[in-house]
């Protein structure tokens, strides 16, 4: 289905939980967030019904996010349910990687095709600091397990943070030289905890391009939020995602579903459409509600305008 700006919307990002086993400083408060009542959260079966309705509108690509999706009970069975839907061509997951050593093989067998891993430092002490207790060795083990299983290229999502990991950018880039890894640097977005925490820590990805002049530009899919580069002779790629300095709204192909049953036409807007009621009381209207969300997508985000409202959700509740 196309939106009002002739963009083909074929990608659904689904946050299946806002809970997480880490407390990253730019994402979640140290005390965590209040756990929602069971009745407020979509069941995995209900989410599956929404995806089935989405296929009828042209959705063929699904990404599972959180919070941390691997803490949700039944995650492997859920991936299996989604992979059994006729019309779904691609299933991916975004995770912090801590639980991948336990789940990666079962997830692949269930139908998972691709994995993105959020990792902001290769230094165990710095990683533990920003995640408030995370064990980097488990993440690295998870990355290697995904490579072993052929869930490649493994994509590493690195939030570029001034005064924290800007001295590790070269180390991350070097990972792409001899491994099937794509490292993607993401500009720090002013959402939730990061709206205050990150005010003086923003790094433009343009700085990375200027610093590393040996990166060779590559052809990139129009719908990809990343501009890709490669080290000469490298196995993997270096991606730059610039939601602030150079937005990619013109080719946006996605709609987001939150764990509490809200459709978000735009990541950076507080506009939401409730689909929980339709799922539970009027299942024949699920597709209609989905279509209305697609048709309400704005032409572009208003992050840099005076009219922008601070997000009413933290990133852990949206899933990026």
From Swiss-Prot:
* Record-linked CDD domains: Radical_SAM, Twitch_MoaA
Q: What's the superkingdom here? A: Bacteria
Q: Subunit composition?
A: Monomer and homodimer.
- Cofactor annotation: [4Fe-4S] cluster
Q: Do you know which Pfam families this protein is assigned to?
A: Fer4_12, Mob_synth_C, Radical_SAM
Per UniProt, GTP binds at 13, 63, 94, 155, 254-256
Q: Name one GO biological process term.
A: Mo-molybdopterin cofactor biosynthetic process
* Reaction(s) this enzyme catalyzes, per UniProt: GTP + AH2 + S-adenosyl-L-methionine = (8S)-3',8-cyclo-7,8-dihydroguanosine 5'-triphosphate + 5'-deoxyadenosine + L-methionine + A + H(+)
User: Which Enzyme Commission number(s) are on file for it?
Assistant: 4.1.99.22
**What UniProt keywords apply to this chain's record, in alphabetical order?**
4Fe-4S, GTP-binding, Iron, Iron-sulfur, Lyase, Metal-binding, Molybdenum cofactor biosynthesis, Nucleotide-binding, S-adenosyl-L-methionine
**Which residues hold [4Fe-4S] cluster 1?**
20, 24, 27
Kindly indicate whether the keyword Lyase belongs to this entry: yes
Instruction: Give the protein's recorded name.
Output: GTP 3',8-cyclase
Residues bound to [4Fe-4S] cluster 2: 249, 252, 266
